[in-house]
Amino acid sequence: MRRPVLACSVLLLALLAAAQAALTPELSRELADAQYVYIQSERKTGDFGKPSEIWFFVDGGKLYVGTRPSSWRVKRIKAGRTRARIAVGSPQGPSFEATGALVKDPKIEEKLMRAYAKKYPDGWARHAASFKDGFRTGERVLVMYTPR
């Protein structure tokens, strides 16, 4: 009786590990050095849209962006089209597929703003207030991309 239970437990753990896709070490290095990612969100046809350059930060193996709720990436996520292709550094750079989700997490929003201040010191001074106020008022939303 113990062997079937053990075999089922091992299989379940393997399936859970596969479901928790992670960034490769190479992509993690590329992301650490990149200033921008280029996100292509899923259209109604199932194809990906045009790549859109955006600031980002990575935390816990997930990629986060702060954006306006009127952006195509947000509209498509709200419509249930959560697949995205994310290119690192340039539209032709190394890429991965991810699943997008809207999240409301003040701790992650704070981490994002601290990361942006450090990573984008020249541009952040112009945008800091709109991000901080925007997250509070809903004029900015947090999108989390989980690698597939």
What function would you assign to each model-found segment?
Residues 1-4:
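Positively charged n-region of N-terminal signal peptides that target proteins for export
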Residues 7-16:
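Bacterial N-terminal signal peptides
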Residues 17-21:
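Boundary at the C-terminal end of the N-terminal hydrophobic targeting segment
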Residues 22-40:
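Short N-terminal segments immediately surrounding and downstream of signal-peptide cleavage
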Residues 25-27, 42-43, 128-133:
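Short, P/G- and charge-enriched loop/turn segments at secondary-structure junctions
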Residues 30-31, 48-50, 57, 78-79, ...:
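Extracellular/periplasmic catalytic domains that process cell-envelope and extracellular macromolecules
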Residues 34-68, 84-86, 95-97:
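Short beta-strand segments
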Residues 72-142, 146-148:
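Short, structured beta-strand-loop surface elements
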